[in-house]
């Protein structure tokens, strides 16, 4: 069972601030999910330029590159200049660059707008998570993290389903209109979010300037596990449409519904995360995450037709717990004054895995076919689950516990 520092148990800023904080992770999920159902149509549109499938997949995942770079920078800027300022600026860029996909004239302009969107999303997600750490503590913080992932999964499921319908009705550009939903979130953040502790912000800024990276470097195993987790959790959205198109004839709406099953299950898994953590330690939860990815990915390959929805749903168990688990571990294992940068690297790891997904699958698909690639990569996750279980049995729940003090 997790043990949080006693002083954190009383830190609870209330439901309104929690709601605004979790809007960031929720709408950042649109960066990858909004155009997911449009991938086959987008691939046909760009097929004359070369390999339409890889072009479409990379237009979907290219924001990850900017996000990977921008997230640690935004964490540092938040520590130096205040998280509220970074949050508001990132919301404005999110709305403008996201909706630009409605009008982009060619692949190049679409790529530029998607890169800007990725940078805005990285700053938005990093700052939102850091604000959760500022405003909440202990099990309350873990519940807020879980609810944030749940809301993100709800938005992602809605985006996948609505995106498929929009593609069928209006073409592949239509899902980019979903990014306009960031405008009311920007307005709400303007009125609700204010620095909770002015003196703490100033202290953090001074410490950030000293280049104190040692507590962050110790977290590298957590970042590596999150990269692998993200490869698994995004498999239905990135590879699923192509697997479904290869194995059966389905409309974009039907494909979107099957892929959305992962996000729907993730909603419930994430909403229950705070309760799961009262029973299971972090290593045990990570083993559960890897098992769900492995079994779910293999089930998507092995089950026929619409029954693939069960594989997608199993993947949702891990998708609902992975991000909150790693974030909880980082809050516990790093001191307050590095949380901005530590969470920035968390976001970088999260989207590095998303960007790597097509490149991990590509050589396996070329060598063995897409269906066999699902089997092979799914089996690799099962092996990783077994390794985590063995580690848990030998070493115990070493990830649980408060951060070590750093002078």
Task: Describe every region a protein language model picked out.
Residues 16-47, 236-241:
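Extracytoplasmic
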Residues 39-68:
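Extracellular/periplasmic helix-loop-helix junction of adjacent transmembrane segments
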Residues 219-260:
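Extracytoplasmic gate region of multi-pass secondary transporters
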Residues 333-370:
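A late C-terminal transmembrane helix in Major Facilitator Superfamily
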Residues 70-82, 269-281, 365:
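Helix-to-loop junctions at the C-terminal end of transmembrane segments
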Residues 68-107:
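Conserved MFS/SLC helix-loop-helix module at the cytosolic interface between two early adjacent transmembrane helices
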Residues 139, 147-194:
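Helix-loop-helix hairpin linking two adjacent transmembrane segments in secondary transporters
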Residues 113-152:
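Cytoplasmic helix-loop-helix junction between adjacent transmembrane helices
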């Amino acid at each position: 069972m997790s043990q949080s520092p006693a002083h954190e148990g009383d830190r609870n800023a209330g439901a309104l601030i929690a709601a605004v904080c979790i809007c960031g992770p929720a709408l950042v999920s649109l960066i990858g999910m909004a155009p997911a159902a449009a991938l086959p149509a987008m691939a046909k549109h760009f097929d004359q330029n070369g390999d339409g499938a890889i072009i479409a997949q990379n237009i979907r995942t290219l924001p990850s590159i900017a996000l990977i770079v921008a997230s640690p920078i935004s964490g540092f800027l938040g520590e130096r200049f205040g998280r509220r300022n970074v949050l508001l600026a990132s919301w404005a860029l999110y709305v403008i660059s996201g909706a630009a996909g409605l009008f982009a004239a060619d692949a190049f302009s679409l790529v530029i707008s998607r890169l800007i969107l990725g940078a805005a999303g990285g700053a938005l997600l990093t700052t939102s998570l850091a604000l959760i750490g500022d405003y909440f503590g202990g099990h309350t913080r873990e519940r807020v993290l879980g609810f944030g992932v749940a809301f993100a999964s709800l938005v992602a499921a809605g985006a996948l389903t609505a995106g498929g319908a929009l593609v069928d009705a209006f073409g592949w550009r239509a899902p980019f209109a979903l990014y306009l939903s960031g405008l009311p979130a920007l307005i709400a953040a303007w009125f609700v979010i204010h620095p909770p502790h002015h003196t703490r912000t100033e202290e953090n800024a001074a410490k950030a300037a000293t280049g104190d990276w040692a507590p962050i470097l110790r977290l590298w195993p957590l970042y590596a596990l999150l990269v692998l987790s993200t490869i698994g959790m995004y498999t239905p959205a990135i590879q699923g449409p192509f697997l479904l198109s290869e194995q059966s004839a389905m409309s974009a709406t039907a494909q979107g519904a099957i892929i959305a099953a992962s996000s729907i299950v993730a909603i419930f898994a994430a909403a229950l995360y705070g309760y799961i953590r009262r029973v299971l330690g972090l290593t045990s939860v990570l083993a559960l995450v890897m098992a769900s990815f492995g079994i779910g990915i293999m089930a998507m390959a092995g089950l026929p037709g619409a029954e693939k929805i069960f594989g997608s749903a199993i993947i949702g168990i891990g998708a609902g717990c992975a991000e909150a688990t790693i974030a909880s571990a980082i809050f516990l294992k790093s001191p307050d004054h590095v949380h901005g940068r530590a969470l920035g690297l968390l976001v970088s790891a999260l989207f590095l895995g998303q960007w790597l997904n097509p490149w991990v699958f590509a050589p396996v698909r070329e060598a063995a076919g897409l269906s066999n690639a699902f089997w092979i990569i799914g089996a690799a996750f099962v092996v990783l689950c077994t390794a985590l279980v063995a580690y848990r049995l030998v070493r115990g729940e070493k990830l649980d516990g408060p951060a070590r003090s750093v002078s």
